[in-house]
Amino acid sequence: MFDAKLTHTVEDFAALLLPLSENDLEREWRWKDHDEEGIRFACFVTLQELRHLAVTLATLRPKLTPAQHILSQYHAAYMDLQAALLGLSREDAERVPAEGEWSVRQAYSHILGTDIGFTSVVRYALESHRAGFWKPARMSDEDEMRIIGMSEEEYKTLTGGPLDGMLAYHRGFHPTIIEEFSKIKDKELDLPSTFWEETRFPIQHRLYRYEAYFTQHTIQIDKTLVAIGQAPSESKRLIRKIYAALAEAEGMMIGAEKIDDTAILGTASSILERTREIEGLLR
């Protein structure tokens, strides 16, 4: 679904730019007629290319279904969180900003656990409705473990483990959710589902909750990073914008079974060439 070459190319560009100081960003770099803003301007060129790619892809595919559109919003929130955590050491991930507050690792554990929980609720509701036996009762613990594909012990090991382990798991789990739920039909969005609340919210509500929940706790993590002395540098702020643009372009790939990848590969090649050029300047 998502293009691995494009994703990895943007990640490599981000990894190169992340440690740069403001002085580094001002080092000479030229793009066409722009020769006064230095390496910093490479971020803006990359941003524009990714935004243009999103616009181009929108013209090459059928209109996003409502479910696919909601999932693209969720994907944008996921990517924003990933960008916020770039460059964070394991030691800093464990630092608590104040007594009684969560470390970044604890906050991410909560996000991942809830992501898994939301997914189990939607999967169970779809499974039950499609089989014609949906009931308003909550799923059993056995059904929940079956649906998430891990035992309770495995779940606790994952969410109680180091941040890098959770990030690695999430990188595989997230696109699986997108791919699976991109096939939800419009009429299924209004079907009821059961979680901890008394209200049997429709599946559509559950899908919207992904983005809302990520946003809530990404802000929490942003505040924590500032409190532990890890406020974002200019480079990281620029990279976060680039990840947002990548997310928009990838959002246009959701549910697109056949799409001309010429524009995708062209954008990836352009960013790769720019990365190599800047690498040469920094040596």
Where do the PLM segments sit?
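A short, structured beta-strand-centered segment in the mid-to-C-terminal lobe
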Residues: 2-6, 154-172
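Hydrophobic alpha-helical core bundles mediating ligand binding, dimerization, or RNAP-core interactions
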Residues: 10-13, 74, 78-81, 122, ...
